[in-house]
UniProtKB/Swiss-Prot annotation:
Name of the molecule in the record: Uncharacterized metalloprotease bbp_296
A Pfam family it matches: Csd3_N2
CDD domains for the chain: M23_peptidase (cd12797)
Homology family: Belongs to the peptidase M23B family.
Membrane-spanning ranges: 24-44
EC number(s) reported in the record: 3.4.24.-
Record membrane topology: Single-pass membrane protein
Keyword set includes rRNA-binding: no
GO annotation terms (biological process): proteolysis
Originating organism: Buchnera aphidicola subsp. Baizongia pistaciae (strain Bp)
Protein origin, superkingdom: Bacteria
Organism taxonomic ancestry: Bacteria, Pseudomonadati, Pseudomonadota, Gammaproteobacteria, Enterobacterales
Subcellular localization, as worded in the UniProt entry: Cell membrane
One term under GO cellular component: plasma membrane
Gene3D superfamilies in the cross-refs: 3.10.450.350, Glucose Permease (Domain IIA)
Length: 376
């Protein structure tokens, strides 16, 4: 008998000669007694019986009978076993925390399945209304659902895949892990099959999804604060000659030539620090995005927000104009990091995990990817 502390499991290994001498009911009795006398919490543990391939090929009937009565047993090997209308692929099993693989049932059929005995669920589905209903039935929070749907749709768009492309969702069943305490379940990860290299997103404590390398699946910032492309009339330049003052002075942002009245968007979530008029900047807006970043938008025709307002990425905050010290209709856009101005082109639009968090994330990601591979 071997204990694996990482996954909170017990491994029992029997010789084939021993197995052949007893009936499957005897095995169930042995395991039941063992569990009752064990200090390990039943609902957070699992038993793994290890058989070699020759035994399994010759004794499929026994194994099927053994699996059905004990729902938290998974076997190691290369052949498949039918498991209560679910298909478990058992090859290369090295301690998966996943019990069953659930395919994309219609909503009504899913309601008829008892999922309370599952710790983890893999759900294969398209991202559509049926998917959202199923996630809600599985007691996943709307915020979690919205988050994963947004990330997946973005990845599909980036990789030029159809929006009805199928993906795999890994759900943690908290009602099982917490002994039926009412708590929302969590989508831990998603996998999008894509050629020879699949696309992954992994849920973190930050309530965001990150890829295998620790980079956020969804951007936290827009590249620029508008939807269409506009000509750069003046680049970021610490030593620029100022056409207004006729002196060398830093140009701390980028100027985009655009028609007056062009909608200007917040590049990310944040709070409005300033929304007023000044002689030089004209109508301008300053947004604090987090503890690190501040963005500024100048020479606006109209301001659509006020100090203290909370804004989301892509919220319309103003209209471009030609106010203040300006030689023509344009938007002056600045980005500040830790109170120092940076070139807006160098803004990292996706969040990156660092140091300890990154190491833990990569380890977690590798484990989950292995489990996705098992159920293909």
């Amino acid at each position: 008998m071997t204990k694996c502390n990482i996954f909170n499991m017990i491994f029992l290994k029997f010789s084939n000669a021993f197995i052949k001498k007893i009936k499957y009911l005897s095995i169930i009795s042995i395991i039941s007694v063992f569990l009752l006398n064990s200090s390990i919490v039943y609902s957070c543990s699992k038993i793994i019986l290890i058989f070699d391939n020759n035994f399994k090929e010759n004794n499929k009937n026994i194994l099927n009978k053994l699996v059905l009565p004990i729902k938290n047993i998974i076997l190691k090997g290369t052949s498949n076993l039918e498991f209560n209308d679910y298909l478990l692929k058992l090859s290369n099993f090295y301690g998966s925390p996943i019990h069953k693989c659930i395919y994309n049932f219609p909503y009504k059929k899913l309601q008829n399945n008892n999922l309370n005995n599952l710790k983890y669920i893999i759900f294969k589905s398209k991202i559509d209304n049926n998917f959202i209903k199923n996630m809600q039935y599985l007691n996943v929070s709307n915020d979690n659902i919205d988050n994963v749907v947004r990330c997946i749709k973005l990845e599909l768009k980036i990789h030029q895949l159809k929006q009805d492309h199928k993906c795999n969702i890994l759900i943690q069943n908290n009602s099982f892990l917490k002994h039926n305490i009412v708590q929302k379940n969590i989508i831990l990860s998603f996998e999008i099959p894509y050629n020879t290299k699949n696309i992954y997103g992994f849920f973190t404590k930050k309530n965001k999804f990150f890829d295998v390398h620790g980079i956020s699946s969804a951007p936290i910032f827009l590249k620029f604060p508008f939807l269409k492309k506009y000509r750069i009339s003046s680049k970021f330049n610490p030593n620029r000659f100022n056409p207004i003052t006729k002196k060398n002075s830093p140009h701390q942002g980028i100027d985009f030539a655009m028609p007056i009245g062009t909608p200007i968007l917040s590049i990310g979530d944040g709070v409005i620090l300033n929304a007023k008029f000044s002689i030089q900047a004209g109508n301008y807006i300053t947004i604090q995005h987090n503890c690190s970043y501040i963005t500024k938008y100048m020479h606006l025709k109209k301001i659509l927000v006020k100090i203290g307002d909370k804004v989301k990425m892509r919220d319309k905050i103003g209209l471009s104009g030609n106010t203040g010290y300006s030689t023509g209709p344009h938007l002056h856009y600045e980005v500040w990091l830790h109170k120092k101005v940076i070139n807006p082109k160098n803004l990292k639009t996706r969040e990156c995990l660092i140091k300890k968090n990154l190491k833990e994330h990569i380890n977690f990601s590798n484990i989950i990817i292995t489990q996705f591979e098992i159920f293909k």
